[in-house]
Amino acid sequence: MTSHIIPCSPTGNGHRIELAGTDLIFESIDNIFVYPLLDIDRLKQAISRALSIWPILAGRVLINEDQYLIEFSDQPIPFTYIENDQLEYWPNLPVVVDDMTICKPFIDVVQYKPMDESLLRIKVTRLLRSNEYVLGTSFSHLIGDAASNIHFLNDLSRFYQGLEPILPRPIFDRYLWTKDDADVSLLSNLKPYQNADKREIIATNFVRDQTTTDQLNISFSSIQLEKLHSLADGKDEVTVHDVLNAYMIVTMNKNSIEISNEYFQRAYILVNYRNLLHSIAPTGHVANSFVIMITSDFPNPFSLISIAKTIRQAINKCHDKLICVWDTNEVVINSNFKYDWSNQVDFGMINQFRFHTITSLKSYFRIFHLNPIKDQEDHWIKDNNGAEVSFRIQKGEMKNKFLETYQQDIETNFINVE
């Protein structure tokens, strides 16, 4: 059954913001949260309150000649509640679920760029046999990135618990770059745009990669990550996160050089620039506030510390290199490790709910905190500093060699990693 929820206090006042061309590239951020209990009436009230301080989500897209705008029009958002008596319980799944047929029935997906489409859709499915509640959220990427999404969901979680949101409040106005902002000294950095393909070609390549690669979800406990970090000479210069990415690249390179005489030479890194460029993206800014940077060539593509330092240097430099696709000798790092979804959106059920998202890509590392699990006594426990890395890898020998190396490293406590 679908109903509609309006802001408890209309605050949009017809305000409009203009979207950047890069905002139109993306579709929606679709997530699933599985809880042992949800009060549906209280959830609806929390959504209504949240919409009042997030009027952009109660808005609609307008097109004015060549401009795309969002008008804060205080429109209702759809809320769907259904009951499922077929599924015995929510299965034990990795954070990133590659099989869309599992997750799609539990998400009411925001449609891409139609004129009268809600920018947020929420669906709750109660599993009658286990009494679990599956909350599916679809958040238009026109609104913002993962940081924007988690900001809204954290506000929603706190309203549900009867708490006030944590400051700062969301900031919606945007600064759009113009021709007058152009810096010709950056033109040499725009070479990656030459590799950009049309949407149809990218979709075709995506389908091809889905058939020639398999998804891997690799988990690391907090103890294992600490051990990896300790192996990096000069570890004070790099973070645990840098070393984790370096380990993934080193492992792939050592196997790839044996199989195909190729290896990854660089990495693209998605970096959130909120509060780095405070004048255009302060803390709390709601937008797609990230840049995609490329590292320099790895001085030693088979060295843990060499790659980790190269990654850290690129992040620290944080210069503009916006791209659309990457080459065969490059990987992409898109990490959510900064955001612990299962702590930010717990609705008061600390370490008792699981978070899932969909889609993995070839040579594209998506990094998340581990979900809580149940111990032998059926109690929920969580390794708060553990990580899951999801990516797609070539089927056959490449995948098998990677898994073999990873499993040996885990069993030997990374004794062969250097």
At which residue positions do the language-model features occur?
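Long, hydrophobic, well-ordered secondary-structure blocks that form the structural core
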Residues: 145, 152-163, 173-175
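Small-residue-rich loop/turn and linker elements
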Residues: 57-101, 165-194, 259-290
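Acyl-thioester-dependent condensation/acyltransferase catalytic cores
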Residues: 48-142, 146, 161
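Acyl-CoA-dependent O-acyltransferases
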Residues: 1-68, 211-418
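Flexible, P/S/T/G-rich "lid" or insertion loops adjacent to the active sites of thioester-utilizing
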Residues: 178-236
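Cytochrome P450 heme-thiolate monooxygenase catalytic domain
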Residues: 95-99, 149-155, 314
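Short, charged low-complexity linker/loop segments at the C-terminal edge of domains
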Residues: 161-166, 398-399
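Short amphipathic alpha-helical face segments that pack within enzyme cores
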Residues: 147-155, 243-248
